[in-house]
Design a protein with these regions (language model features):
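Charge/polar-rich, low-complexity and marginally structured segments
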Residues: 52-195
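Broad gene-expression machinery/nucleic-acid interaction feature
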Residues: 13, 33-35, 47
Length: 195
């Protein structure tokens, strides 16, 4: 059970602070059932009510500083999602987001950066679906790493790229050819990935 003041990841809502643990005085709600009242960190006035024993939506603690640093070191080895069928790919994105696992968010980001670069080289824009999942994955990953590392979220992409580039040489993605370490380069169209 979490305590008031804890920061947790709550499903696709992202990081929330537990502001209260209470029963709800509402019709149709058992009087003795405990609920977390959560405040999403990205919404000053937002509130989420969820049963303490909710098993339908993933709830977990924010990763530690050590876990965040380890994840960043492992980013070059995390493979993207290479699914040709649009509907199947979107379903996989949905599954990855729902898992609330940072490594799965990295997989989405790496995949979508490469797709974006490939599409730009062909004179095409990123699709609306890709853009939506890219924003969700980046938002969730960067906000969690920001809290874990005590670094402003706005500087997280550069921080990740710098950390990886300090320790890694360019790596090969087993499925698509050369991929520069870090996830920032591909976003800006500065990598050498061939589509």
């Amino acid at each position: 059970m979490y305590e008031v003041g804890d920061l947790i990841v709550y499903g696709r809502t992202g990081i929330c602070e537990v502001t209260e643990i209470t029963t709800l005085k509402m019709d149709g709600v058992p009087k003795d059932k405990l609920y977390y009242i959560l405040r999403p960190v990205r919404e000053k006035h937002g509130k989420v009510f969820t049963p303490v024993d909710n098993e339908k939506i993933v709830m977990r603690r924010v990763i530690s500083k050590e876990e965040a640093e380890k994840l960043i070191r492992e980013i070059p080895q995390i493979e993207g999602l290479w699914i040709g069928n649009e509907k199947q790919r979107e379903e996989k994105y949905r599954e990855c987001m729902k898992s609330c696992k940072c490594a799965e968010w990295v997989r989405i980001i790496k995949t979508l950066y490469e797709r974006k670069v490939s599409r730009l080289k062909q004179g095409k824009k990123i699709t609306a679906t890709d853009e939506r999942y890219l924003r969700m994955a980046e938002g969730n990953l960067y906000s969690e790493l920001s809290i874990a590392l005590g670094i402003p979220e706005s500087g997280m992409e550069a921080y990740i790229s710098n950390k990886i580039n300090e320790t890694e040489e360019p790596v090969l993605c087993s499925c698509r050819g050369p991929v520069l370490p870090g996830i920032a380069g591909a976003k800006n169209g500065n990598d050498s990935t061939e589509g």
